Amino acid sequence: MSAGDVLTILFTSLMAMVPIVLTSVGAAWSERAGVVSIGYEGVLLISAFFGAIFAELAGSAVVGLIGGVIVGILLGMLHGALTVYLKGDHVIPGIGINLLSLGIVPFGILAYWGTAGQHQLPEDATMWHLATPYGELSPMVLVTIVIAVVTWWVLFKTPLGLRVRAVGENPEAADALGINVERYRFWSTVYGHALAGLGGAFMSVDWLGLVHKTMSGGRGFIALANMVFSGWNPLISLIGGWLFGFFEALAAWLAPKHIIPGQFILMLPYIMTLIIVAGIIGRARPPKWDGRPYKRE
């Protein structure tokens, strides 16, 4: 492996980390407030689909990214309404979003573009990239880093973040201090899903330039693993997300080399996810009220 190959893998890993980091950061904020969602895989897929539609209609990738955020917000409001205000189970709505994506995206691609399973976006609907000898970089890489750092700073260094963490650790005490637990939990859920929506739209209108019925590729679940690996810390999620992106980039580099069987190469990012998660089981410390509905008495 030459120095150029190493740089190619590193550049690819920066692109691959974006949807994982954005989703991990959003999930960490939401769970710090006490709301669990396992529906980020579906959010990524649905927002990738609708982001592509918005981008094509407007002829602008930026509009597509905004469209993905809007889709994430709507799905987050749905999840928040069911879990925060209706006191429903936190897992079931996420499963519903994942199942919805498996139906709506393949059908939508066929109905809207008339193609089976995949559609290539025109050039004017995709984001420009900075070209280098070792690969291309999107401005979304920098945006993702800024979002992770700012989210960490707000969560751990500001009164707003203190209140968010309070409703996830001890909502009864927070309520007694006059903090509106339901409001903070609801909007934290919306923020988490909005970031996942941005990550989904990034995949279609920026990174890959296409829509595919399975393009999320398990990244929503990998992002949740990264969130746990990072200890619900958005800043560490940035490092963990790059690590997962590195293994995905390494798999992409190895695939045409035929050094090891292709099936194993495709499994590599998921094998590393299992190894990392297995290594932290029993040591992870989620917020005390994570996933528990709060009912004011």
Write out the residue ranges for each language-model feature.
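Helix-loop-helix "hairpin" substructures at the membrane interface of multi-pass membrane proteins
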Residues: 60, 134-211, 234-239
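Hydrophobic core segments of alpha-helical transmembrane domains in multi-pass membrane transport
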Residues: 16, 23-24, 48-52, 102-106, ...
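Short, non-helical or kinked segments that cap or interrupt transmembrane helices
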Residues: 29-47, 84-97, 163, 187, ...
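Inter-helical junctions in multi-pass inner-membrane proteins, predominant
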Residues: 8-10, 155, 192-225, 256-261
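Transmembrane helix-bundle core of multi-pass membrane transporters
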Residues: 90, 101-157, 257-265, 291-297
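Cytosolic-side transmembrane-helix boundaries in multi-pass membrane proteins
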Residues: 151, 169-183, 254-297
